[in-house]
Amino acid sequence: MDNHESYQTLEEAFAATFIKELIPGILHNFANPLNGIMGRTKLLQRRIEENFKKLKEIYPDAAAEMMEEMQRIKKDIRSVSQESESFHDIFKDVAAKFYALAAKGEDNVNISQLINSEMRFFDFNLDLKHDIKKNIRLDNDAPDFRGSTAELSMAFWALIRFAMLRALGSKMKEFSITTEHDNKYVSVFIKNSGDALPAASIDVLMERIDSGSREMTNSVIDRGVLNALLILNKYNARINMFSEESFSTISIGIPYRNERPKRK
């Protein structure tokens, strides 16, 4: 084994332990100072207002001379507060993804909330954030169902990434994702622009899902899509994929009434 192979082996070992061993500590170490910055900034805003009010009462002439400078100071503090809140939102998006990956047990899952978190996480990929026209329509009344957040997060990450990359490689660069529900299913529809997927590839994919096989060769549909749909198949999901000249759609309907996931 040469140095390159040794490095690759260590790199893979590092990646394999990164989420479980390092991410919780990294998030914790970021959260504490960030919360401190936000709290101190709010406190500073209040103190500035209170002290300047006292200054105007005791030394009105001096306060009048300092008014312009005080307005600049308050504006700067507001900017710091707004930027720290923006950073906090970004931090929450990152944390939500890694907490989802750690939630391997069975729990109540809301599909719209999960998809919203996944889409916010994809904003960290700047090509996918800026170069694709996205249409996101989420059913805020979608009911929960029982499942593993970790499994579902990984499955929908793979499906969304596949669709977004195909959209990115197309002329129209369009992507849409929709959630909805009826009296039995919560459903997700993922649609992207791009060349039509070969019917033969779709047929092979559906056969693999039915058989539980993870073999997927000589196909424009990557193995990540197959693995994602195999996971969803354990939830008794209705899975369909169809493709036309310029768009492809993956639809998944997961039962939520008196249904428990099948574990294979």
Model-inferred region functions:
Residues 227-236:
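Conserved glycine-/histidine-rich ATP-lid loop and adjacent helix of the Bergerat-fold HATPase_c
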Residues 177, 235-243:
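Glycine-rich ATP-binding loops of the HATPase_c
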Residues 100-104, 144-147, 237:
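Conserved micro-motifs of the catalytic ATP-binding
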Residues 131-143:
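Conserved catalytic submotifs in the C-terminal HATPase_c
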